[in-house]
């Protein structure tokens, strides 16, 4: 489906879309409440770093992220088209730096972080938005030629760099979000689904071959856990999913109450990270979990609406990519916690622990807000 833009010129209204502001505020404020509740679980686990964890999340993640949101909102989104290739190149180089001894950090079998001394950063988070921006810029330049072989080449070429680097880390969760986001931009630009499907099947074939090697066998284990969770051992690959489902189910319709969850204290792995949606559902119930899902769904619909009303093709494609990235990441996380998809390790947007993810997500939201200011005069 090709994205159709308004032909009239854009004008800076000075005001962001009100509904978008409300949705973002609800997710950010609600996410802060749920993170605070989930962080209490560290006390029962004997952690002495709860103050540092909370400070890093709110000061470096939310606080600095809101500053970047304001910056993203203040910069004319069309300027990102000029710097797109340089930003993408910088993000690729930064993501490669995780392999430099003494700088790169390894955790849980993956090399995904850079140690700056006073803070650690995950450069692949920057790669998400950089890939979206460069995709929007390139496909906007192609215009009608997006439906030709040039469009397919652009899709494959932009995805190839992140694919090679993230496969070495390995981090297929982040790679999946990048590919989904680029895919959305490509489809909106007019690239044929059949062509992308053929390329996608080839990529899946390569991934299946990789799972036969020891380094990537964990991918096969996660898929096997998703297909047959009952066959896993009590503390095996299916443990996190089972504990997540227990937490979600025990919340009932209205939940145990904010801060009253039990699973976060000892049983639920990563209650502030991947599993925070389970904490939301246990404490706020089916109603609270449903509201969380509904907010993300509305955010996606609003983002695509902004894309359709954008005065130029680049703005429309950029809005599609950002909306897909922010909402797609959330739905992938939630689906895994509900046992509807394999575990990927991607965070719940605006809610999970992770300063780099929070900062980039908020900056991306700022860019989307700026696009919403550019509606043509009626």
Predicted features, each with a name:
Residues 1-8, 331-378:
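A juxtamembrane structural motif centered on a specific transmembrane helix
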């Amino acid at each position: 489906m090709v994205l159709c833009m308004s032909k009239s010129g854009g004008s800076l209204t000075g005001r962001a879309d009100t509904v978008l502001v409300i949705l973002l505020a609800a997710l950010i404020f609600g996410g802060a409440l749920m993170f605070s509740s989930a962080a209490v679980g560290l006390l029962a686990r004997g952690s002495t770093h709860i103050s540092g964890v909370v400070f890093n999340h709110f000061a470096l993640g939310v606080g600095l992220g809101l500053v970047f949101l304001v910056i993203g909102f203040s910069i004319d989104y069309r300027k990102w088209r000029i710097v797109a290739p340089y930003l993408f190149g910088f993000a690729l180089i930064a993501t490669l730096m995780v392999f430099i001894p003494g700088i790169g950090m390894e955790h849980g079998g993956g090399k995904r972080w850079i140690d700056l001394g006073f803070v650690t950063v995950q450069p692949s988070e920057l790669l998400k938005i950089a890939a979206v921006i460069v995709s929007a810029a390139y496909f906007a330049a192609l215009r009608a030629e997006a439906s030709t072989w040039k469009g397919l080449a652009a899709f494959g070429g932009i995805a190839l760099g992140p694919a090679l680097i993230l496969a070495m880390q390995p981090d297929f969760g982040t790679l999946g979000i990048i590919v989904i986001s680029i895919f959305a931009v490509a489809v909106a630009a007019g690239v044929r689904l059949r062509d992308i499907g053929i390329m996608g099947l080839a990529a899946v074939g390569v991934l299946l071959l990789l799972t036969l090697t020891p380094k990537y066998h964990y991918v096969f284990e996660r898929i096997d856990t998703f297909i047959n969770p009952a066959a896993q051992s009590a503390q095996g690959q299916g443990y996190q999913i089972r504990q997540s489902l227990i937490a979600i189910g025990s919340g009932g319709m209205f939940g145990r109450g904010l801060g009253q969850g039990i699973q976060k204290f000892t049983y639920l792995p990563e209650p502030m990270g991947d599993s925070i949606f389970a904490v939301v559902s246990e404490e706020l119930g089916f109603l609270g979990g449903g509201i969380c899902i509904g907010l993300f769904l509305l955010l996606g619909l609003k983002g695509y609406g902004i894309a359709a009303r954008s005065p130029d093709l680049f703005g429309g494609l950029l809005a599609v990519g950002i909306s897909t990235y922010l909402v797609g990441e959330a739905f992938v996380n939630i689906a895994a916690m509900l046992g509807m998809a394999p575990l990927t390790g991607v965070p719940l947007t605006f809610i999970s622990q992770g300063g780099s993810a929070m900062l980039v997500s908020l900056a991306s939201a700022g860019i989307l807000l700026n696009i919403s200011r550019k509606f043509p005069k009626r």
